């Protein structure tokens, strides 16, 4: 009995010192949300219901009292039918007082074209993303940062970080009787980059969405090869895949769109397009080019 009492005293002492507590509360994701108006949302995720049964990355950053952020866990979570999420493996609130936690989330998590997340600084998430050369394989990159009240449920609100781009074609005289679109290609546009996030940006786009800024951007080619309807008619018709591109406020002098038809290639320099219709690619926004 004396030995048992001594062990119990040691346990109690270890829990109380350094502002620690002994209770283990499960970290619960109580709500998954998604931001943006329906007409500007991404192609893959149009609402939070599209995230049901999907898996996203979830990183916990812990800041003890009067200290600096430190890693706590790096896991994943799967969205349930009721728009809660189950963390795998299960995570528990640390037994600390006067501490805080921040949760970083990113989607997609396990897709072959998913971004990679790094946390060299535990208080910052850096997403590295490379757009697939084929628009058919593009993914809708979402990001979220949550700072819940200690030991309360976590609400995760995802935002779109890329720009949705599509093409509409319409036959205008004197084009030949039958025109088909064989390929649509962006050349010398942003293809890969890094998105560093400590908070959701307070700077917004023209439609009030967070303006995510990608850095270390490398340019390249991204194309769509239509497989369904690709015939241009007198009625304006969307043709080709939806592109999900890195946002940019400044296109290079050599950036262009190359459209391949059954009659050959036609090039459209962005400098010429912008001269007639000034615009930029903003995160969470939808750009459609009429050709």
Indicate where each model-derived feature is located.
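Sec-type signal peptide cleavage vicinity
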Residues: 1-2, 10-291
């Amino acid at each position: 009995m004396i030995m048992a009492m001594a062990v119990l005293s040691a346990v109690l002492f270890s829990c109380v010192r350094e502002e620690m507590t002994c209770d283990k509360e499960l970290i619960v994701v109580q709500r998954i949300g998604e931001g943006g108006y329906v007409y500007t949302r991404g192609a893959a995720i149009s609402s939070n219901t599209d995230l049901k049964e999907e898996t996203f990355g979830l990183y916990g950053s812990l800041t003890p009292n009067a200290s600096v952020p430190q890693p706590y866990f790096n896991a994943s979570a799967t969205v349930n039918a009721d728009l809660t999420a189950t963390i795998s493996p299960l995570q528990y609130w640390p037994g600390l007082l006067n501490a805080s936690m921040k949760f970083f989330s990113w989607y997609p998590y396990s897709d072959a074209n998913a971004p990679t997340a790094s946390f060299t600084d535990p208080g910052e998430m850096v997403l590295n993303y490379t757009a697939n050369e084929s628009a058919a394989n593009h993914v809708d990159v979402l990001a979220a940062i949550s700072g819940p009240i200690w030991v309360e449920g976590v609400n995760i609100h995802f935002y779109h970080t890329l720009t949705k781009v599509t093409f509409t074609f319409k036959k205008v005289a004197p084009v030949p009787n039958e025109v088909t679109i064989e390929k649509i290609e962006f050349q010398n546009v942003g293809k890969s980059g890094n998105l560093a996030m400590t908070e959701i940006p307070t700077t917004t786009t023209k439609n009030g969405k967070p303006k995510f800024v990608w850095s270390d951007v490398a340019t390249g080619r991204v194309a769509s090869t239509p497989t369904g309807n690709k015939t241009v008619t007198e009625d304006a018709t969307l043709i080709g895949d939806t592109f999900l591109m890195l946002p940019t406020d400044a296109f290079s002098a050599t950036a262009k769109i190359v459209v391949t038809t059954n009659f050959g290639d036609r090039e459209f320099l962005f400098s010429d397009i912008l001269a007639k219709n000034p615009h930029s690619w903003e995160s969470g926004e939808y750009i459609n080019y009429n050709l």
